[in-house]
Amino acid sequence: MRGKLTLQQRLILPIVLLGLVALLSNILAVFSINNVHANAGTIVDEYMVSEGKLEEIRRSMMDIHRLALSHIVAEDHATMIRLVQEIKAEEAGLDEKLAGYESFAAGTDLETYQSLLRDYEAFKHALVYLVCASADSKTQDAYAMANGDVALWSEAAEADIDALYASVSRQAEAARGRLSIVYITSLVISAVTLVIGVLL
Protein backbone atom coordinates (compact mmCIF):
# COMPACT_ATOMS: atom_id res chain seq x y z
CA MET A 1 0.00 0.00 0.00
CA ARG A 2 2.79 2.29 0.94
CA GLY A 3 4.64 1.66 -2.38
CA LYS A 4 1.42 2.14 -4.33
CA LEU A 5 0.80 5.50 -2.66
CA THR A 6 4.32 6.61 -3.51
CA LEU A 7 3.74 5.59 -7.12
CA GLN A 8 0.55 7.64 -7.20
CA GLN A 9 2.42 10.58 -5.75
CA ARG A 10 5.13 10.17 -8.37
CA LEU A 11 2.54 10.16 -11.11
CA ILE A 12 0.62 13.13 -9.73
CA LEU A 13 3.67 15.30 -9.00
CA PRO A 14 4.55 16.10 -12.67
CA ILE A 15 0.90 16.88 -13.38
CA VAL A 16 0.72 19.24 -10.40
CA LEU A 17 4.01 20.88 -11.42
CA LEU A 18 2.83 21.23 -15.01
CA GLY A 19 -0.38 22.82 -13.76
CA LEU A 20 1.58 25.26 -11.61
CA VAL A 21 3.87 26.14 -14.54
CA ALA A 22 0.84 26.66 -16.79
CA LEU A 23 -0.80 28.86 -14.15
CA LEU A 24 2.41 30.85 -13.64
CA SER A 25 2.85 31.14 -17.41
CA ASN A 26 -0.67 32.51 -17.83
CA ILE A 27 -0.26 34.99 -14.97
CA LEU A 28 3.05 36.22 -16.41
CA ALA A 29 1.54 36.43 -19.91
CA VAL A 30 -1.34 38.58 -18.65
CA PHE A 31 1.11 40.77 -16.72
CA SER A 32 3.32 41.15 -19.80
CA ILE A 33 0.38 41.95 -22.06
CA ASN A 34 -0.80 44.61 -19.60
CA ASN A 35 2.70 46.14 -19.52
CA VAL A 36 2.96 46.21 -23.32
CA HIS A 37 -0.56 47.62 -23.60
CA ALA A 38 0.11 50.33 -20.99
CA ASN A 39 3.33 51.44 -22.69
CA ALA A 40 1.75 51.41 -26.14
CA GLY A 41 -1.25 53.33 -24.78
CA THR A 42 1.04 56.00 -23.33
CA ILE A 43 2.81 56.40 -26.67
CA VAL A 44 -0.45 56.76 -28.58
CA ASP A 45 -2.58 58.65 -26.05
CA GLU A 46 0.05 61.05 -24.80
CA TYR A 47 2.97 61.54 -27.16
CA MET A 48 1.33 61.11 -30.56
CA VAL A 49 -1.66 63.26 -29.55
CA SER A 50 0.73 65.88 -28.20
CA GLU A 51 2.65 65.95 -31.49
CA GLY A 52 -0.61 66.29 -33.41
CA LYS A 53 -1.76 69.19 -31.24
CA LEU A 54 1.57 70.98 -31.72
CA GLU A 55 1.21 70.63 -35.51
CA GLU A 56 -2.29 72.15 -35.30
CA ILE A 57 -0.91 75.06 -33.23
CA ARG A 58 1.89 75.58 -35.77
CA ARG A 59 -0.58 75.54 -38.67
CA SER A 60 -2.86 78.06 -36.95
CA MET A 61 0.08 80.42 -36.32
CA MET A 62 1.03 80.23 -39.99
CA ASP A 63 -2.57 80.84 -41.10
CA ILE A 64 -2.87 83.93 -38.88
CA HIS A 65 0.44 85.27 -40.19
CA ARG A 66 -0.66 84.66 -43.80
CA LEU A 67 -4.00 86.42 -43.22
CA ALA A 68 -2.22 89.42 -41.70
CA LEU A 69 0.07 89.69 -44.73
CA SER A 70 -2.96 89.38 -47.01
CA HIS A 71 -4.49 92.34 -45.17
CA ILE A 72 -1.59 94.55 -46.29
CA VAL A 73 -2.17 93.80 -49.98
CA ALA A 74 -5.98 93.87 -49.79
CA GLU A 75 -7.40 96.35 -52.29
CA ASP A 76 -10.67 97.31 -50.64
CA HIS A 77 -12.11 97.80 -47.18
CA ALA A 78 -14.59 94.93 -47.50
CA THR A 79 -11.71 92.49 -48.03
CA MET A 80 -9.80 94.04 -45.12
CA ILE A 81 -12.82 93.66 -42.82
CA ARG A 82 -13.29 90.04 -43.91
CA LEU A 83 -9.60 89.31 -43.28
CA VAL A 84 -9.77 90.88 -39.81
CA GLN A 85 -12.77 88.67 -39.01
CA GLU A 86 -10.87 85.61 -40.24
CA ILE A 87 -7.85 86.60 -38.13
CA LYS A 88 -10.06 86.96 -35.05
CA ALA A 89 -11.67 83.57 -35.69
CA GLU A 90 -8.26 81.92 -36.16
CA GLU A 91 -6.96 83.57 -32.99
CA ALA A 92 -9.96 82.31 -31.01
CA GLY A 93 -9.33 78.80 -32.32
CA LEU A 94 -5.63 79.03 -31.50
CA ASP A 95 -6.43 80.29 -27.99
CA GLU A 96 -8.47 77.12 -27.45
CA LYS A 97 -5.75 74.89 -28.89
CA LEU A 98 -3.11 76.46 -26.66
CA ALA A 99 -5.34 76.12 -23.59
CA GLY A 100 -5.98 72.48 -24.52
CA TYR A 101 -2.27 71.79 -24.81
CA GLU A 102 -1.55 72.84 -21.22
CA SER A 103 -2.35 69.35 -19.89
CA PHE A 104 0.44 67.92 -22.10
CA ALA A 105 3.08 70.37 -20.81
CA ALA A 106 4.87 69.07 -17.72
CA GLY A 107 8.27 69.53 -16.13
CA THR A 108 10.66 71.51 -18.29
CA ASP A 109 8.07 71.59 -21.08
CA LEU A 110 5.85 73.75 -18.87
CA GLU A 111 8.42 76.54 -18.99
CA THR A 112 8.60 76.32 -22.80
CA TYR A 113 4.80 76.28 -22.98
CA GLN A 114 4.65 79.48 -20.86
CA SER A 115 7.21 81.05 -23.21
CA LEU A 116 5.02 80.06 -26.17
CA LEU A 117 2.01 81.77 -24.57
CA ARG A 118 4.01 84.96 -23.96
CA ASP A 119 5.40 85.00 -27.50
CA TYR A 120 1.94 84.37 -28.95
CA GLU A 121 0.48 87.29 -26.94
CA ALA A 122 3.27 89.57 -28.22
CA PHE A 123 2.59 88.27 -31.76
CA LYS A 124 -1.11 89.17 -31.41
CA HIS A 125 -0.26 92.70 -30.20
CA ALA A 126 2.12 93.18 -33.14
CA LEU A 127 -0.65 92.02 -35.49
CA VAL A 128 -2.97 94.72 -34.13
CA TYR A 129 -0.43 97.41 -35.06
CA LEU A 130 0.12 95.83 -38.48
CA VAL A 131 -3.61 95.68 -39.25
CA CYS A 132 -4.14 99.25 -38.01
CA ALA A 133 -1.33 100.57 -40.22
CA SER A 134 -2.63 98.56 -43.16
CA ALA A 135 -6.23 99.77 -42.65
CA ASP A 136 -4.97 103.37 -42.43
CA SER A 137 -3.26 102.89 -45.85
CA LYS A 138 0.19 103.15 -44.23
CA THR A 139 1.54 100.32 -46.32
CA GLN A 140 5.22 101.01 -45.60
CA ASP A 141 4.57 101.00 -41.84
CA ALA A 142 2.57 97.78 -42.19
CA TYR A 143 5.41 96.11 -44.10
CA ALA A 144 7.93 97.37 -41.53
CA MET A 145 5.77 95.87 -38.77
CA ALA A 146 5.40 92.61 -40.74
CA ASN A 147 9.17 92.33 -41.16
CA GLY A 148 9.84 93.57 -37.62
CA ASP A 149 7.80 92.65 -34.56
CA VAL A 150 5.35 90.31 -36.30
CA ALA A 151 8.19 88.26 -37.82
CA LEU A 152 10.17 88.39 -34.56
CA TRP A 153 7.36 87.07 -32.36
CA SER A 154 6.21 84.58 -34.99
CA GLU A 155 9.73 83.11 -35.13
CA ALA A 156 9.96 83.07 -31.32
CA ALA A 157 6.65 81.17 -31.07
CA GLU A 158 7.82 78.81 -33.83
CA ALA A 159 11.02 78.13 -31.88
CA ASP A 160 8.94 77.33 -28.77
CA ILE A 161 6.78 74.93 -30.78
CA ASP A 162 9.92 73.28 -32.21
CA ALA A 163 11.36 72.89 -28.70
CA LEU A 164 8.13 71.32 -27.40
CA TYR A 165 7.93 69.01 -30.42
CA ALA A 166 11.56 67.90 -29.95
CA SER A 167 10.93 67.21 -26.26
CA VAL A 168 7.80 65.17 -27.00
CA SER A 169 9.67 63.23 -29.70
CA ARG A 170 12.46 62.40 -27.23
CA GLN A 171 9.92 61.23 -24.65
CA ALA A 172 8.12 59.13 -27.27
CA GLU A 173 11.44 57.56 -28.31
CA ALA A 174 12.24 56.74 -24.68
CA ALA A 175 8.76 55.19 -24.29
CA ARG A 176 9.33 53.12 -27.44
CA GLY A 177 12.60 51.90 -25.91
CA ARG A 178 10.78 50.91 -22.73
CA LEU A 179 8.12 49.18 -24.83
CA SER A 180 10.83 47.16 -26.63
CA ILE A 181 12.36 46.13 -23.29
CA VAL A 182 8.96 45.09 -21.93
CA TYR A 183 8.22 43.17 -25.14
CA ILE A 184 11.58 41.33 -25.09
CA THR A 185 11.16 40.58 -21.37
CA SER A 186 7.71 39.17 -22.10
CA LEU A 187 9.10 36.94 -24.84
CA VAL A 188 11.90 35.67 -22.57
CA ILE A 189 9.48 34.92 -19.73
CA SER A 190 7.13 33.10 -22.12
CA ALA A 191 10.03 31.10 -23.60
CA VAL A 192 11.37 30.13 -20.16
CA THR A 193 7.96 28.98 -18.91
CA LEU A 194 7.43 27.06 -22.16
CA VAL A 195 10.79 25.29 -21.79
CA ILE A 196 10.04 24.44 -18.15
CA GLY A 197 6.65 23.09 -19.20
CA VAL A 198 8.23 20.91 -21.90
CA LEU A 199 10.91 19.62 -19.53
CA LEU A 200 8.28 18.56 -17.03
Regions found by a protein language model. Give the residues of each.
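Amphipathic alpha-helical packing segments from all-alpha helical-bundle domains
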Residues: 85-100, 156
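Amphipathic alpha-helical segments and their boundaries
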Residues: 11-64, 77-84, 103-120, 154, ...
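Short, Lys/Arg-rich, polar N-terminal cytosolic tail immediately upstream
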Residues: 1-4
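Cytosolic-side ends of inner-membrane transmembrane helices, especially those
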Residues: 14, 189, 193-200
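Juxtamembrane amphipathic/coiled-coil helical coupling segments that flank
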Residues: 30-47, 65-69, 98, 108, ...
